[in-house]
């Protein structure tokens, strides 16, 4: 059985930027569990607006498509590595989850 979270294909960062910027601020939404992995302190600092801003204004250092067809997007944020999992749909982007990862957890693709 394949790991549904394993990245099967690397996406050029420029291609992802062009794709994500086709969506408006309002079309990017919480998928329902996006903030579940965060501590209460992190939830005070990170809200949906911050994640939207990150997606629309910042440049990730790595983007890939997972076996489950979700996008895994990796950013350097405040000196840490941030992994954001997105489900891109025709009319909206759902933030599935996001969390900080260690350097060794960055996939080698």
Task: Identify the residue ranges that each predicted region occupies.
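Ribonuclease/tRNase effector modules and their secretory precursors
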Residues: 1-109
């Amino acid at each position: 059985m394949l790991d549904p979270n394993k990245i099967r294909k690397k996406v050029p960062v420029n291609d992802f930027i062009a794709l994500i910027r086709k969506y408006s601020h309002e079309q990017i939404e919480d998928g329902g569990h996006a903030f579940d992995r965060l501590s209460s302190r992190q939830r005070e600092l990170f809200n949906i607006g911050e994640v939207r801003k990150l997606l629309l204004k910042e440049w990730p250092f790595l983007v890939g498509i997972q076996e489950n067809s979700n996008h895994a997007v990796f950013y350097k944020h405040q000196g840490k590595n941030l992994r954001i999992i997105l489900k891109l749909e025709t009319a909206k982007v759902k933030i599935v989850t996001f969390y900080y990862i260690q350097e060794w957890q960055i996939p080698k693709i």
